Amino acid sequence: MSDITFPGDLVYELSPRGVGPTRWTQKNPPNYVERSHALLGRTVDTGRVWDIIAAAQYLHAEHDGVTLVVGGGNAAGVLAAYAAERSPGISGVILHNPPPTHMEPSAPQLLNVLRVCDIPDVLGLIAP
């Protein structure tokens, strides 16, 4: 982390739903939380994008006037890119080793996303 931050930068770590210390179990049958997202016409990854946006809104309210950059590795970086595209308060994104397309098994699962765009398209939308 020290290679992308500067002295005095505030760094916050977000564990969106189903990740980290609040991770839900992966028993058979599939987890009820994951199944309830599907019943609502969403995916868990869609909820994670909204978690990132909500955290960004909170940080803007707490630290008025700061530049907010989000990032992540692999699929989490792609979720950060989608959050940056949807939230004007996010100024930049740092991605580490993102999947090249939503056709990859490791890519975030977002319903019908390939009808509209793919990962390079979203990165192009948020590029300066």
Regions found by a protein language model. Give the residues of each.
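Primarily recognizes the serine-hydrolase "nucleophile elbow" in alpha/beta-hydrolase
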Residues: 55-125
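Cap/lid segment of the alpha/beta-hydrolase catalytic domain
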Residues: 1-62, 102-108
